[in-house]
């Protein structure tokens, strides 16, 4: 309508023998300024300064929105934040970055270069997997070296391994290889999922990740090495859809990377871009409620009772917390309290962060990442996900960032992170971590001294632990789960909480609890999806496009 009126106005001016070109330029200038002012009046609130929330804020900044990011913590990063004790920096959450091009694309969208903000280093091997029989399997990006490793340890499974990797590639190509694949598109309509079911059926997506690996290789150790990746996103390898088998190809193609300064350095860089865009971050600010008016989201209410009005709200809080707590006083049709309780939630995490002194020259065979397998795989996973009990044995994921990043620890010292998958708090008679935390930490220490870090107790300097109880309190994660809803077949795509709320216009979701799911690539993709869904008619790019089209049409 604005363009039609402008054309009519200019034709009238031409009839009056006024300078047509000059009038056009004046009107275009007025049009741009007016539209820019409208854009700046559109306010978006992002609840949560995790990777998903920060990425969404960056994208909305480009689209012309006034953005306010609020977070209850005193630092950015959410699960990707860090703490410092005695000169040791402990990364609390993700320790590796896969698919770094997603970060590069995000920065490019903002007209910037990621490498100007963050120093990302490739790591190889990705991780060393140890087994009780003494076997050490080095997973790495170089295809020929990886095949040599498989041939050395599992010679009868080399051909099966090759077939498995081809299968992994097909899954990746189908689900996540580009912006037009299901992992990077909105799944708002049931039809979006139904139309890909034939392809899912062809790839036997109904099989678990472990069952799919077992189809190709026979050695139980190699089956474990090719199927444990769902644990990185809180899933049961014996239940999670085989589509997650794509991770093996993803690692081979893009490698595994580490950010110098820890993952929190990425979050800080994202925050810097947001501020450069003229937008705001408010830490130590807890949102108690997302408020609605006439059925539409209209802002948030803070814990101090103050309200912040907004045109749209993007929640980076766990989707269970968003619908179960932040919208507690509002009637919901789909994600009711009852439905949330029926969901299967990801496992809990026990993480022991510890510092050592005079160890930089010790434990030469302990690199950046080590997976220490206990005597059981299926049985331990069953105890965690099905029985909900704290097993006597354990498997550990050990991170030693100081071998690659001197800033992580004092001189000659080391910083470590030992993660043990444990049950979440949703079981009857769930673990009382107030009583069990220290005894369990001691068991973790004993396991490390026996299997990986002999003499550890003689070098300990700092200690910090997190349990599912901390995840519940610090991150407001339902049942203290580490990764929101478990990424099972019928808790994925359309079946997962949507990126745009089904119940409340103006509410959008990013992060692990929405589509496409947990993991750094997943939460970055969720922000990309939300940016596609949010109207961009007042963005800077759209303003210029309208002006250019207007000039051509006159």
Model regions: which residues?
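N-terminal glycine-rich phosphate/pyrophosphate-binding loop and immediately adjacent elements
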Residues: 41-173
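Rossmann-like flavin
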Residues: 132-239
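A glycine-rich dinucleotide-binding beta-alpha-beta segment and adjacent secondary-structure elements
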Residues: 219-233, 391-399, 454-516
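C-terminal segments that line or cap access tunnels to active or ligand-binding sites in enzymes
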Residues: 359-471
């Amino acid at each position: 309508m604005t363009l039609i009126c402008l054309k009519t106005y200019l034709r009238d001016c031409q009839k009056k023998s006024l300078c047509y070109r000059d009038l056009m330029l004046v009107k275009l200038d007025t049009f741009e300024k007016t539209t820019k002012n409208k854009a700046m009046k559109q306010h978006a609130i992002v609840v949560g300064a995790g990777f998903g929330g920060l990425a969404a804020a960056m994208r909305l900044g480009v689209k012309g929105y006034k953005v306010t990011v609020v977070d209850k913590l005193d630092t950015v990063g959410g699960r990707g934040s860090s703490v410092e004790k005695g000169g040791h920096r402990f990364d609390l959450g993700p320790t590796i970055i896969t698919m770094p091009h997603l970060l590069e694309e995000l920065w490019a969208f903002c007209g910037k270069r990621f490498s100007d903000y963050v120093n990302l280093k490739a790591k190889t091997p990705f991780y060393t997997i140890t087994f009780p029989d003494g076997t050490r399997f080095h997973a790495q990006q170089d295809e020929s070296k990886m095949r040599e490793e498989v041939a050395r340890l599992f010679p009868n499974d080399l051909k099966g391994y090759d077939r498995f990797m081809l299968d992994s590639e097909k899954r990746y190509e189908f689900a996540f290889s580009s912006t037009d694949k299901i992992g990077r598109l909105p799944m708002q309509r049931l039809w979006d999922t139904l139309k890909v079911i034939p392809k899912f059926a062809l790839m036997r997506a109904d099989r678990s990740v472990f069952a799919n690996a077992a189809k190709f290789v026979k050695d139980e150790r190699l089956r474990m090495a090719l199927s444990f990746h769902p644990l990185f996103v809180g899933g049961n390898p014996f239940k999670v859809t085989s589509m997650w088998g794509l991770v093996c190809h993803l690692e081979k193609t893009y490698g595994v990377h580490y950010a110098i300064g820890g993952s929190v350095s990425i979050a800080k860089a994202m925050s810097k871009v947001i501020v450069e865009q003229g937008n705001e971050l408010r830490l130590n600010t807890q949102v108690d409620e997302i408020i609605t008016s006439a059925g539409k989201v209209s802002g948030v209410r803070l814990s101090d009772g103050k309200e912040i009005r907004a045109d749209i709200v993007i929640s980076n809080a766990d989707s269970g917390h968003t619908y179960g707590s932040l919208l507690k006083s509002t009637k919901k049709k789909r994600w009711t309290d009852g439905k949330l309780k029926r969901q299967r939630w990801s496992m809990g995490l026990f993480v022991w962060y510890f510092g050592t002194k005079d160890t930089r020259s010790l434990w030469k065979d302990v690199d950046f990442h080590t997976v220490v397998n206990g005597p059981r795989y299926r049985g331990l996973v069953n105890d965690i996900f099905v029985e909900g009990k704290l097993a006597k044995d354990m498997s550990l994921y050990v991170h030693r960032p100081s071998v690659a990043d001197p800033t992580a620890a004092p001189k000659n010292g080391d910083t470590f992170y030992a993660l043990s998958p444990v049950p979440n708090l949703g079981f009857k008679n769930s673990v009382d971590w107030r009583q069990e935390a220290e005894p369990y930490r001691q068991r973790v220490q004993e396991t490390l001294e026996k299997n990986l870090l002999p003499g550890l107790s003689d070098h300990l300097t700092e200690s910090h632990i997190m349990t599912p109880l901390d995840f519940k309190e610090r991150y407001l994660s339902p049942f203290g789960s580490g990764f929101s809803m478990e990424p099972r077949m019928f808790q994925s795509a359309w079946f997962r909480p949507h990126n745009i709320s089904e119940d409340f216009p103006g509410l959008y979701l990013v992060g692990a609890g929405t589509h496409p799911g947990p993991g750094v690539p997943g939460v970055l993709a969720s922000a990309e999806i939300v940016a596609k869904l949010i109207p961009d008619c007042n963005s800077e790019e759209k303003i210029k496009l309208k002006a250019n089209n207007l000039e051509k049409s006159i």
